Amino acid sequence: MTTKQTSYIFVSGGVLSGLGKGVVAASLGFLLQNRGYKVGVIKCENYLNIDSGTINPIEHGDAFLCEDGLEADMDLGTYERFLDYDMGHCNFTTIGQIYKKVIDRERSFGYKGEDVEAIPHITDEIISRIKKAGQGHEILIIELGGTAGEYQNMLYYEACRIMKAKQPNRIINVHVSYVPLPQHIGEPKTMPTQLSIRTVMSMGIHPEFLVLRSIAILDKRRRYLLGLKCSVPGNNVVMSPDVKSIYEIPLIFAQQKFDKKILKELNLSYRKSNLDEWHKLVKKISKPKDKKVKIVIAGKYFATGDYELSDSYAALIEAIKHAAWHLNTEVDLKFINTEDIEKQGVKLIGKPDGIIVPIGWGSRGAEGKISTIKYAREKKIPYLGLCYGMQLACVEFARDVVKLKKADTTENNPQTPYPIIHDIPMSSKYQTIKGKNTSMRLGAYDCYLSDKTQIAKIYKKYKFCKKVSDIYKKKNNITAVGNCVISERHRHRFEFNNEYRDILSKHGMIFAGTSPNNMFVEMIELPKKIHPFFIATQGHPEYKSRPNKPHPLFIEFVRAATK
């Protein structure tokens, strides 16, 4: 399909950040996809970073890890969970990527002596990226990052204006804005939205639709008057109220016929939709729960000033919820900063039903994580370690069970006499080279599971693995033990040191999964006779969980917590 056949929907935001443009874009995409349209999506970010991988999660939330190794904005996780297909490099761009591409082209004489400027050269590159993302899709949704009026995103808006001028019948604009309801006044105030629309219009963009974020649904009269003041037809003012679960939003939009109105505006035909499965999902989420469990997430990316943010672990929290809904269980999440555990001890953990140590970097809070893992192991509390949570579980086991007291990671202690975790070789054969002295093992990798392990049984139970023959393994030089193959996403630059595999095995640790060449330890567990549920993975199963397809490891972790 050529780009001329693709229709484009730009989603912008006003008044404040964090409105939920990503949820609006994903919900609209889901509804159009449900009608049989091939829907693509791309997030256009404002920052100069090439990707989200080097940004502290406290600054911009959880960097979402894609199958192809892209470290992207967390909105791509929202897209995956709603649209149920994998995102990648074509679904994400930053202004840093755009500038780098243009400058590299200029340095290579790609502009043949032209005076390279923001307009048209930067805007042309933006438009080129958008059209490339639209290839193969009937509809492409473009989420513009940031808030209307910020200087950082003005070139995205200019690119949108240019595209609209060239293809007026193929492009529409949806503006998401906030309508506050101050308690001391007692009525919604629409002036912030009016000013936001004026800002967008001053850039030559006239939204066809207005999506209002508010505590509650505005009455018809206010929607009509607001539409009149914003030059948006009253029927095209759509409500997106606060809800208990974001998965309710597609149904709320469908009730307002948002998708039908979009198709009419684009002169696209109506196709039948069937939202039965989504209704079942929302019903499952909202119905009373049979059980309740308390889960501790022990990390360090929670606090920002006096406030606690959950966005730093957005994908993890979603994965836990998906599993809990599957088991009709209510989850009470408790966030504990492991630096506080270092100062005050494991008494902070209390008596949870399950403990998770997620991704992390560096020495800050690492000893608190190790203490948490020891607490989970000795108290026989169900434990799930993710990435750093697996590495530090190996360190804790080496210190406290094998009695290698000074065991550590070379990341935190380069001089450790027992480097249980060490650097992955700096080679493109094993890692993605991101820059000078900067590398990472990124993206989806296969893992072979030992057949009789708990982990293999879990993946087989939910049909998340495939079985291969010994003949296939021999033909492809696969030396890993086991015939059960899975794939998980990875994001790390340190690995388990295989010199310590035998001694840890002799003391009870099971190396349940490895890379095909047996080089990388991917999964560990403790036998059930030692611990009811102690599983850790170098991968990131949280990024593959979907609301209607919860990840097996999270299902069984939550199940263990209920016991």
What spans do the regions from the language model cover?
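Flexible phosphate-sensing "switch/lid" loops adjacent to ATP/NTP-binding sites
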Residues: M1-T329, E339-G354, G362, K369-Y375, ...
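Short gly/pro/ser/thr-enriched loop/turn and capping motifs at secondary-structure boundaries
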Residues: L48-I50, Q391-C394, N413-T416
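Cofactor-cradling patches in redox/metallo enzymes
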Residues: P358
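Rossmann-like NAD(H)/NADP(H) cofactor-binding core
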Residues: G40-I42, K334, L384, T537
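Glycine-rich, charge-decorated loop segments at or immediately adjacent to ligand/cofactor-binding or catalytic sites
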Residues: P182-K189, Q391-D400
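Repeat-solenoid scaffold signature
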Residues: R377-A393
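Amide-donor transfer/coupling interface in amidating biosynthetic enzymes
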Residues: Y79, I122, I215-N236, P241-H322, ...
